[in-house]
């Protein structure tokens, strides 16, 4: 059963939840919330501002060289410098710490909107729009998303490109053999950006690649094109691996023991964070979901 016709009382419940979720998200910004523990001007933001200043004030080549730890200039991050390159050259609000934080907060609001559109793009014929808004609000409850939104941290850039990637992935799956190369190019581009924004998100392009190669109904030629696009977009990252001698910048690699020590517990930690944002997709994956509203009580019954 699909959620096209919703009870009026349930619509009211949905509206109230949506309103207060969005309101609390906005209030969190004005009160400088730090629910994940990494925010604050003395927290991770000081590294963010240092890295941004590096690409804002130095020659591009010198700044890139600094990520390899070969200079007295310090680059402090486990991610590639793409976040800082884009902001240094494209973000007009980087003259002060406060204006930069505001710009990332606005960017995060767009990320939330993009989450809504990615859900709507996939389920628009099956689910009432208000229910999609309700499901998309889950991202506003994440302490990681909230803290990154309020303190200009790095995490939300990867989340942003995940949602864009899923929009193009859905378009390709819906079109099957009629999918065009432009959509395939954009899918490869944005899902590759996921890795540049956070190496852990390598799972995203791998998922798309394997799905379209094995289960996808696109033509063989387009499958080859997809592989070639991914190969081309991986070249800058291959250069960074050559520059660093590792998959993350030198200073963080040495501090974390990357490729030297395996932290098994981090696998569960990372998967938990990623899975949080996929809850609406997993919830809606079930075809037989029955919604029951009796005596002002809401219950959901899933039939396998």
List the model feature ranges, each with a label.
Residues 44-75, 82-85:
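Extracytosolic helix-loop segments that constitute the early lumenal/periplasmic catalytic or substrate-binding loops
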Residues 74, 78, 82-103:
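Juxtamembrane segments of multi-pass membrane glycosylation machinery
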Residues 117, 157-175, 183-191, 205-208, ...:
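Specific aromatic-rich, kink-prone transmembrane helix
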Residues 89, 98, 102-125, 164:
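Transmembrane-helix motifs of polytopic, lipid-linked glycan transferases
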Residues 1-31, 296-303:
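Start-transfer (signal-anchor) and selected internal transmembrane alpha helices
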Residues 147-157:
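Short acidic/glycine- and proline-prone juxtamembrane loop motifs at membrane-interface regions
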